[in-house]
UniProtKB/Swiss-Prot annotation:
<keyword id="KW-0457">Lysine biosynthesis</keyword>
<feature type="binding site">
    <location>
        <begin position="10"/>
        <end position="15"/>
    </location>
    <ligand>
        <name>NAD(+)</name>
    </ligand>
</feature>
<feature type="binding site">
    <location>
        <begin position="166"/>
        <end position="167"/>
    </location>
    <ligand>
        <name>(S)-2,3,4,5-tetrahydrodipicolinate</name>
    </ligand>
</feature>
<feature type="active site" description="Proton donor">
    <location>
        <position position="160"/>
    </location>
</feature>
<keyword id="KW-0560">Oxidoreductase</keyword>
<dbReference type="GO" id="GO:0019877">
    <property type="term" value="P:diaminopimelate biosynthetic process"/>
</dbReference>
<keyword id="KW-0220">Diaminopimelate biosynthesis</keyword>
<dbReference type="InterPro" id="IPR022664">
    <property type="entry name" value="DapB_N_CS"/>
</dbReference>
<keyword id="KW-0963">Cytoplasm</keyword>
<feature type="active site" description="Proton donor/acceptor">
    <location>
        <position position="156"/>
    </location>
</feature>
<dbReference type="InterPro" id="IPR023940">
    <property type="entry name" value="DHDPR_bac"/>
</dbReference>
<keyword id="KW-0028">Amino-acid biosynthesis</keyword>
<keyword id="KW-0521">NADP</keyword>
<dbReference type="GO" id="GO:0050661">
    <property type="term" value="F:NADP binding"/>
</dbReference>
<keyword id="KW-0520">NAD</keyword>
<dbReference type="InterPro" id="IPR022663">
    <property type="entry name" value="DapB_C"/>
</dbReference>
<feature type="binding site">
    <location>
        <position position="37"/>
    </location>
    <ligand>
        <name>NADP(+)</name>
    </ligand>
</feature>
Length: 268
């Protein structure tokens, strides 16, 4: 397999730096571009400076140039930025790995439509462990569909800007689909004041923000006389970066299509 020419969006951020480190360490990948936001004080710096390495790739805000030089773009940024990058990727036939969260349903529809022209993987969480957890939740939801209250509790660092997390929503969507519903039909986001008794048909969400928590997710199936908890905890962002590279390798075999990590891992 020839070396994958990969560009990283949000290259100066926490996740972007982890992705750059992963690409530089991968024997089958080459860092082809490092995209940062317009106005960043780090524009023009070498993308490997934070590692004490010279990559020869400078941080830039020129998405057209980045897409002209790369075959793959890995994007963990924000919805508006990702959609702008998507337009450029479509023009240059660049394959996309998208880990951005916080998309609206119409924005997600744009991503799905793009799969008719280019190959892309979109997942709120690229971790192999999280995606295996989704299969466990699918099985558990069918067994506990009656007589168990379902709550999803997630915790992240103080800098995270969206809530609930994309992973928590993905968990809720998995559970809802396994029980013949849509998440919009049954989700309850936080509780406050006099709420009355719990509606047993709902899926509750609670979000915690604090410190440097990378990402903790627990799904609670609470019955009478017992409760079952399925938990995934991320100790670092390494698992996300490795999952993103795995997604890029998967896309090497596809010219077009909209995929997620369940496809990448063969869990369908």
């Amino acid at each position: 397999m020839s070396s994958m020419k990969i560009a990283i969006a949000g290259a100066s951020g926490r996740m972007g730096r982890m992705l750059i480190e992963a690409v530089l360490a991968a024997p089958d990948a080459t860092l082809a571009g490092a995209l940062d936001r317009t106005g960043s004080s780090q524009l023009g710096q070498d993308a490997g400076a934070f590692l004490g390495k010279q990559t020869g790739v400078a941080l830039t805000d020129d998405i057209e140039r980045v897409c002209a030089e790369a075959d793959y773009l890995i994007d963990f940024t924000r919805p508006e930025g990702t959609l702008a990058h998507l337009d450029a990727a479509l023009r240059h036939d660049v394959k996309l790995v998208i880990g951005t969260t916080g998309f609206s349903e119409p924005q997600k529809a744009q991503l799905r439509a793009a799969g008719g022209k280019i190959a892309l993987v979109f997942s709120a969480n690229m971790s192999v462990g999280v995606n295996v957890t989704m299969k466990l939740l699918e099985f558990a939801a069918k067994q506990f569909a009656q007589g168990y209250d379902i709550e999803i509790i997630e915790a992240h660092h103080r800098h995270k800007v969206d809530a609930p997390s994309g992973t928590a929503l993905m968990m809720g969507e998995t559970i809802a689909a396994a029980t013949g519903r849509t998440l919009d039909d049954c989700a309850v986001y936080g509780r406050h004041g006099v709420t009355g008794e719990r509606d047993p048909s709902t899926i509750g969400f609670s979000a915690i923000r604090g410190g440097d928590i990378v990402g903790d997710h627990t799904v609670l199936f609470a019955g009478i006389g017992e409760r079952i908890e399925i938990t995934h905890k991320s100790a670092s962002r390494v698992s996300y970066a490795q999952g993103a590279l795995r997604a890029a390798r998967f896309l090497a075999g596809h010219q077009a299509g909209f995929f997620d990590m369940q496809d990448v891992l063969g869990l369908r």
